[in-house]
Swiss-Prot record:
Residues 113-122 have a biased composition (Polar residues). Belongs to the TCF25 family. Disruption phenotype: Knockout does not lead to differences in heart size under standard conditions, however in a mouse model of cardiac hypertrophy induced by pressure overload following aortic banding surgery, heart size is increased. It is found in: Nucleus; Cytoplasm, Cytosol. One of its GO terms (cellular component) is RQC complex. The keyword Cytoplasm applies. The gene is Tcf25. This is Ribosome quality control complex subunit TCF25. Residues 124-136 have a biased composition (Basic residues).
Length: 676
């Protein structure tokens, strides 16, 4: 690529600046910047005496077209070639350097000399150009380096503008499988593709100039109905950087800590109005926004619930560290810190709203963002969800790539959702008509191979899946011992929980007739292998007994956040009896506290009579003396029993009516009456 193309790429095209009579000069300088600036325009049509020291006079300005092309050919990768200057120009420069203005001539002679010099210069430069064409083999490596530099410039421009051309993904997206694209974090981008820009932005355009906001954000757009933003005391700091990863943590200042303590008191009071009062003084307190959003969602006010989540997301994004990147996939947030959990939960709830809104591509990008914050531990277990979002977004290539890159060290095939979603992605990819025939055939074969392995490893998935899809299997399948009722009953409880989670979330993806016919073919293939005594069947049975003895805590946390009834019903009793708060469900057992909650001197005085009565009936109720002995170290168990208290109070208030009580009459205030 020539230098002129690079100038156009940078927005520095020639011919856009005002031209003067003396501006049309061809000057060869050592510095590129000096060459692009050019001389200052003169006042007259004739060149003054001092101007002759800087360039050559050009009478016909159209001759500069060929001259610029030749000038670009003299430069390869920012270095000038070893060709010499034309004799007329070099001798003229030497003469002017030695003799000053002694070379001035009459106008007629100068015109003839100028035309002859131009013809000689153009002829010599053409010869040099032909020689350079013959030397392309020598400069091949340098030209390839130049193309790589151009690719880097294009990637930098695309990253800064948030725009990428259709086609193969850029090099930066191939560096990491959790690479996040900025433009896909905006749901309007996906809605524009579905409904058009006029339908999406038609009502938003008149409101754009009503208010000025302090910062441009990627995750959400501030609204004019929100309170004016002021720093709530939330910030982010860089803990350390090692092995190419940067570890960050959110911080609370003293003002925000006071708001956090008031929030915990409001939660213990079981009164949502107390949280509303707190938001009037601290409108961008994240945990209060999360808790109030759940209350609005339970009351089926989805619009208000989503608005509160977006406000919490905006508050946390404004506190980002300058080095914190959403797209690189190399920034980490430790979930063991309570300050960081709010960001995880806010992203998860925003992702859930986007999926329900009909934006699976944007929800997939949020899922990758959450997974990139701590991919090794995966505190919210996003690997149980990312396959579902990829299939809904019809991004089959990404799901296949994630499976191929992570199967070796994460054993994704041992999760029922990946075991069934990946072959489904291969099959749906084989149904596309814009791919070559050999790729379609290869995808179909891989899909059949993987679905047979999934049915062999998880036979208890088939019959519930057919029941969800309202499909009645034939007698050979339903009566066979491998897929019969014993297959679902004999599987471990932890595996049954994963199966219930997957089927409750993704069963509708299997309802197409083409998918069902393909599944039926492979079911019969598996039955033939079972009847033939394939050793892989027994190996899978032994593996199920060893791997799925008990689900880890992050899977239980994911099931609670998913709110899928079938999966929640399969939770063990030790999880369901714990206190589960919406702003911090199932906190880690090794929580890292940066500050502790101050001890309350009289906690009994802050509760209403009904709450105190039921609190005294709880098994974990403690007196004031026992509370003093526990101290602040009992912070992780401060919410024990609050969930059961909430259910008990709601049940009692639902059955308690003041109208059922008989009001005494005024003429008989003491309630005395006749017994007859």
């Amino acid at each position: 690529m020539s230098r002129r193309a690079l100038r156009r790429l940078r927005g520095e095209q020639r011919g856009q600046e005002p031209l003067g009579p003396d501006a049309l000069k061809f000057v060869l300088l050592d510095d590129d910047d000096a060459e692009e600036e050019g001389p200052k325009p003169g006042l007259g049509g004739r060149r003054p005496g001092g101007a002759g020291k800087e360039g050559v006079r050009v009478n016909n300005r159209f001759e500069l077209i060929n001259t610029e092309d030749l000038e670009d050919d003299l430069v390869v990768n920012g270095e000038r070639s070893d060709c010499t200057l034309p004799d007329s120009v070099s001798s003229g420069n030497k003469g002017r350097a030695k003799h000053g203005n002694a070379e001035t001539k009459q106008d007629g002679g100068a015109t003839k000399a100028g035309s002859s010099e131009q013809s000689n210069a153009s002829g010599k430069l053409r010869k040099k150009k032909k020689k350079q064409k013959n030397k392309k083999s020598c400069t091949g490596e340098s030209s390839e380096n130049g193309l790589e530099d151009i690719d880097r410039i294009l990637e930098r421009i695309e990253d800064s503008s948030g725009f990428s051309h259709p086609g193969p993904p850029p090099l930066s997206s191939r560096k990491h499988v959790l690479y996040v694209e900025h433009r896909h974090l905006n749901p309007d981008t996906e809605l524009k593709r579905y409904f058009g820009a006029r339908a999406v932005l038609g009502e938003q355009r008149p409101r754009q100039r009503q208010r000025v906001y302090p910062k441009c954000t990627w995750l959400t757009t501030p609204k004019s109905t929100w309170p004016r933003y002021s720093k709530p005391g939330l910030s982010m700091r860089l803990l350390e950087s090692k092995k190419g990863l940067s570890f960050f943590a959110f911080d609370h200042n003293e003002e925000y800590q006071q708001a956090q303590h008031k929030f915990l008191v409001a939660v213990e009071s079981m009164e949502p109005n107390n949280i509303v009062v707190l938001l009037q003084t601290s409108p961008y307190h994240v945990d209060s926004l999360l808790q109030l959003s759940d209350a609005c969602r339970f009351q089926e006010d989805q619009e208000m619930a989503r608005d509160l989540i977006e406000r919490a997301l905006y508050s946390m994004e404004c506190a980002f560290h300058p080095l914190f990147s959403l797209t690189s996939g190399t920034c980490r947030l430790d979930y063991r810190r309570p300050e960081n959990r709010s960001f995880y939960l806010t992203l998860y709830k925003q992702m859930s709203f986007l999926e329900k809104r009909g934006c699976p591509r944007t929800a997939l990008e949020y899922c990758k963002l959450i997974l990139s914050l701590e991919p090794d531990e995966d505190p919210l277990c996003m690997l149980l969800l990312i396959d579902h979002l990829a299939l809904r977004a019809r991004n089959y290539e990404y799901l296949i790539r994630l499976f191929q890159e992570w199967e070796a060290h994460r054993n994704l095939s041992q999760l029922p959702n990946f075991a069934f979603s990946v072959p489904l992605a291969y099959f749906l990819l084989s149904q596309q008509t814009d791919l070559p025939e050999h790729e379609l055939s290869s995808a179909r074969q891989q899909a059949s191979l993987l679905i047979q392995q999934a049915l062999t490893m998880f036979p208890g998935v088939l019959m519930p899946l057919l029941e969800y899809c309202s499909v009645r299997p034939d007698a050979t399948v339903s009566n066979h011992r491998f897929f019969g009722p014993d297959a679902e009953i004999s599987q471990p409880p932890a595996l049954g929980q994963l199966v219930s989670l997957y089927l409750g979330r993704s069963h509708f993806l299997w309802k197409e007739p083409a998918i069902m016919s393909w599944l039926e073919e492979n079911v019969h293939e598996v039955l033939q292998a079972v009847d033939a005594g394939d050793p892989a069947v027994e190996a899978c049975e032994n593996r199920r007994k060893v791997l799925y003895q008990r689900a880890p805590r992050n899977i239980h946390r994911h099931v609670i956040l998913s709110e899928i009834k079938e999966a929640v019903a399969a939770l063990p009793s030790d999880v369901t009896t714990q206190s589960v708060m919406g702003f911090d469900p199932l906190p880690p057992l090794d929580t890292i506290y940066s500050y502790v909650r101050p001890e309350r001197l009289s906690p009994v005085s802050h509760g209403n009579t009904i709450a105190l009565f039921f609190r005294s009936l709880l098994p974990n109720y403690t007196t004031e003396g026992e509370r003093l002995e526990e101290g602040v170290a009992g912070g992780p168990n401060r919410n024990q029993g609050l969930n059961r208290l909430m259910l008990a109070v709601r049940d009692m208030m639902a059955n308690f009516h003041f109208n059922d009580l008989e009001v005494p009459r005024e003429d008989n205030p003491e309630g005395e009456g006749d017994w007859d």
